[in-house]
From Swiss-Prot:
This is mRNA cleavage and polyadenylation factor clp1. GO terms for biological process: mRNA 3'-end processing; tRNA splicing, via endonucleolytic cleavage and ligation. One of its GO terms (molecular function) is ATP binding. Belongs to the Clp1 family. Clp1 subfamily. Required for endonucleolytic cleavage during polyadenylation-dependent pre-mRNA 3'-end formation.
Amino acid sequence: MSLPGLELTQPSAESQSASAPPTQINLSAGSEWRFEVAFGTTVRVKLLTGTAELFGTELAPSQTYTFSGTKAAIYTWHGCTLEVSAGDAVSGLDGTTSASGRGGLGAGGCQSEYIAEETPMVEYANVHFALEGLRAEAKASGRDGPRVLILGPEDAGKTSLSKILTAYAVKVGREPIVVNLDPTEGMLSVPGTVSATAFRAMLDVEEGWGSSPMSGPSAVPVKLPLVYFYPIVNPLEAEGSVFRPIVSRLALSVMGRMAEDEDAKETGIIVDTPGILSQSRAGALEMINHIVTEFSITTILVIGSERLYSLMMKSYDNKPSSSASSAASDERISVVKLSKSGGCVDRDAAFMKAVRESQIRTYFFGNPVPTTASSALSISSSSTTNVTLSPHAQQLDFDAIALYNYTTSSAEEDQNDEDDYDPAQLTTDSFLPGNNEAESASSLPGLNSAANASAAAAAGALVPLKKVPGPAPSALANTLLAITHASPTSSPSEIRDASTMGFLYVADVDSERGKIRVLAPVGGRVPSRAIIWGKKWPAEVVGLVG
């Protein structure tokens, strides 16, 4: 269409929406292609020739992979050729494509992409082979396999290294147990959780760790995570009084799995940690020591911090491990320094917010990004499909649920928090076990019932967890609720230490009628269990439903 007087032609809608032709990228042996894709856009990658891997998981030849909201790198040991093209736009939580979701100027619409010749992959591979040697020794002597702790500052590549070591272990037939202690990102779960999973099958190239059991199809075998809810962004909050016992419960479950599963025992565990533990904060070193002790760590990998490496060397190198099976063999801790990859980039607050929203949306609605799941469903291998889930909506009487909320907060939040910490509310008999009756609490040897009741009340007061009274607070809207395995009348410590059954999303709150409308991943009545409110973390997720 011509513009009058200017003799210029306005581009048609078809020409504007036409995507650029695919770009071929040739990688030499030992190099990697680093790329960043914004949320709201997709980039398709196909391996044409050679071999390549993404965080240790090999790409299948001639298979199209779709990425969105990703910062990653594809590495090749022997050289390869990739085909990169722009994919379709993906709507956000509100059904629209955000301005930040426009494609970039790189190949296929990537925000940033380049080829790097210098990578730490040889170091990481050497770590894998060293761990394999330790696993072989453990099998021969009947001991537990290596227990690996990964430390480093924020955005140093700790999770990427965890994926690489896990993928390499699975590739040689091992069964590593991976532990995620970072509540800012969920592993096979939503943000605000810590979890552990035994990996028997390959990781998902497009979705990272893969997916937990769901009612929809999956191209990669699903994993079964053990999840604990920690709705606080800082593990050191309240001097670690909440995070520390959760770590202990998770470690107890992991060690129990290793005792019963011979494959997991021989392979060992890999523990990923939050970057805040590597900062010079009060309580950080104590928390690291707690993790080392509870998981009987034998190998500490430090990435991107000379100060932390020096501190770990002084504190742990060549010191005896706390493993029960190491008493006879005198197993000792090794501290190893690894190089930080040049591909590690800072993830700003806006990107991390989008990551959290994407994980929560995927939990309830499935993945909106077209994936390769169609090939697993015997559909045309050249096509892709969306894995769409339909959550079940239902109304709940607020007075009929046992909703609890953590009252720990930073000094800044204390000034504006309507739920200020009140120890008096934590010492009421409503937190005592046995249907709110102090008399039904189990007796302690050598103590009378009055002393036992006082001890139980004092123990409950130490846990910053209180029951949310009616009417239903409006702040519940657009937040997550975690259904625990604890009964509604359990003590605060029992609720804190209970693992999670699943999550609800509060779509609407009617305070006048005392009802809330929630989304659940499965149908049926909500179990009568203690429910924990994710008020402060992962906080509000607006626009999940219309």
